[in-house]
Amino acid sequence: MQRKLTLSIDAMGGDAAPGVTIDGTAEFLAGRPEAHVLLYGDEARLAPLVAAKPGLAGRVTIVHAAEKITSDMKPSQALRRGKGSSMWAAVEAVKEGQADACVSAGNTGALMAISMLVLRKMEGVHRPAMTALWPTLRGRTVVLDVGANVDADAEQLVTFAIMGEAFARATLGIERPSVGILNIGSEEMKGHDEVREAHELLRNSPLKMDYRGFVEGDDISGGAVDVVVTDGFTGNVALKTGEGVARMLAGRMREAFTASLTSKMGAALAMSGLKRLKDFMDPSNVNGGVLIGLGGVSVKSHGGADARGFARACELAADLALSDYRTEIAANLARVGSGGLAAE
């Protein structure tokens, strides 16, 4: 028997909300018969959109929230003025036990700030981290932090490794995920003090982690490890660079295959392979960043995601809510506590 699941959704967040949000919710619910959704937002706008989709009857509950967090609102402003917003209400539902996880495609900084204030940090977590799933030659790799913290000391990097390992197990289905620290080289003497100290801490820790040492930038897309650990500044630059390269390649391929009649014929012959490549590179298939290390599940969908992309973010939230990844994180943080992080 499947466990019942409830998601709280900020229906007003995102570039094309609430239309895309409702469409994505419908797609998510079509594949999750055990799920129910709480939709937070302007009831007058949401009700007709929900009514137009018969599949949502009895599967969603609209909860009116008069305010909306705008895309240009600073995190500090969101904390001061956002309590009546759809985003705040969706996060609050997780805290109050009304929902198992929340999803928003709204303002990233605001969602992070509200989630940290409302859900609080897990015991032993000094700084939560933002995760991303990265397409690789081997499938998918978890990268964290990708923007929650501009810097991180050695012990925080170790915490990121612990959280990333549990996250990979829950989302990728890997029994013993491999973990590496992003560095400018694989040699032990490379990098700044923080990454070298974190390397020693992980290598000598009591954890049964499959720690592989340092990895380089090209190892991310190569799939050298299942979890890549870094600070938020480096991780965000890497993520945005990867997204830019993917868009550039897609554009160049489109130009190449439409440049002449011969190239168009070649594209027609290679259509099935090109479709597989397009699907692999489509960011909608890996949509959803998670602020990990909190007392509840908060998932950030890309603001420009289409319905399929938003549905993927909801699926990620559901998978995490049904997993015991936070219990694993707490247990491993306890194991390395009380002096267990002292490097030899």
Curated annotation (Swiss-Prot):
Keywords: Cytoplasm, Lipid biosynthesis, Lipid metabolism, Phospholipid biosynthesis, Phospholipid metabolism, Transferase. Gene3D superfamilies: Isopropylmalate Dehydrogenase. It catalyses: a fatty acyl-[ACP] + phosphate = an acyl phosphate + holo-[ACP]. Pathway: Lipid metabolism; phospholipid metabolism. Pfam families: FA_synthesis. Coiled coil: none annotated. It is found in: Cytoplasm. GO terms for cellular component: cytoplasm. Its EC number is 2.3.1.274. GO terms for biological process: fatty acid biosynthetic process; phospholipid biosynthetic process. GO terms for molecular function: phosphate:acyl-[acyl carrier protein] acyltransferase activity. Its main location: cytoplasm. Catalyzes the reversible formation of acyl-phosphate (acyl-PO(4)) from acyl-[acyl-carrier-protein] (acyl-ACP). This enzyme utilizes acyl-ACP as fatty acyl donor, but not acyl-CoA. Belongs to the PlsX family. Homodimer. Probably interacts with PlsY. This is Phosphate acyltransferase.
